[in-house]
Regions:
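Alpha/beta-hydrolase fold nucleophile elbow
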Residues: 91-103
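Glycine-rich "HGGG/HGxG" loop immediately N-terminal to the catalytic nucleophile
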Residues: 56-72
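Gly/Ala-rich beta-loop-alpha elbow adjacent to hydrolase catalytic centers
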Residues: 100-110, 126
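The alpha/beta-hydrolase serine catalytic core
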Residues: 72, 96, 116-227
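A short loop-to-beta-strand scaffold at the N-terminal edge of the catalytic core in hydrolase folds
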Residues: 1-13
Length: 227
């Protein structure tokens, strides 16, 4: 076990007591940079309503222990969500937890929550349902930013790629490639909110699978995602 850095947003004394808290699962790379301030404000606002909120850095990312290229990244990121849930319950006294995930963070949250009995709800913003498609997307975005290859003085180790601020070893890419949320066999939470991108078809297959597994699913399109 390695320490993770987290930010616990406690509810003010005058807020009504709640039994549910929020864990925020941020995206990665450039997407994490773009969403950081909004997620911090959301955590603060949620805590102000009486729901303690926890933000954290996954294992090997940000200020948490470990490195980008450590082995077993996919499993470690999912374990990080579990640790965050446990820490929020321990630190705040809540009994139930809601997860809010953005992009790949939503994917990790969904997989980490499956099989737990203390995740009351899952909210996904533009979730990555197919890992292979997401890898293609971030490679294309890297190319459009004029950074298809790093300069020679910053050459990457063999088998390592860098896309929009995210370093991935071959093992991590292979793990992400196998991700298909539409094939999950356990529901992550009794209630799921899915906010799809407005520039892509809705994630109908995944939502149908969630309903088949017994989850109540509320699905909407999030306007202005690309902007």
């Amino acid at each position: 076990d390695r320490p993770l850095l987290g930010w616990l947003h406690r509810s003010p004394a005058e807020a009504p007591p709640r039994v549910t808290g929020l864990v925020i699962c941020n995206p990665f790379g450039y997407e994490a940079l773009c969403s950081h301030r909004s997620l911090r404000h959301f955590a603060e606002a949620t805590a102000g309503l009486g729901y303690p909120s926890l933000r954290f850095d996954y294992d090997g990312t940000g200020d948490s222990a470990g490195e980008d290229l450590d082995p077993d990244r996919w499993e470690a990121w999912q374990q990080s969500v579990g640790y965050a849930i446990d820490e929020l319950r321990r630190s705040s006294g809540v009994t139930d937890v809601c997860l809010l995930g953005v992009r790949l963070g939503a994917t990790i949250a969904a997989l980490a929550a499956a099989g737990r009995g203390d995740v009351a709800a899952l909210a996904c913003i533009a979730p990555v349902v197919n890992g292979r498609a997401w890898l293609r997307e971030i490679r294309a975005l890297q190319a459009t930013m004029g950074r298809a290859e790093p300069p020679p003085e910053f050459a990457l180790p063999e088998g390592v790629t860098e896309s929009v601020g995210l370093l991935l070893a071959e093992e991590a890419r292979e793990s992400i490639t196998r991700v298909d949320l539409a094939a999950i066999t356990a529901t992550p939470a009794p209630a799921c909110l899915v906010l799809d991108r407005d520039d892509r078809p809705p994630n109908a297959a995944w939502c149908a699978q969630l309903r088949e597994l017994g989850a109540a699913v509320d699905q909407h399109v999030l306007p202005g995602f690309v902007e």
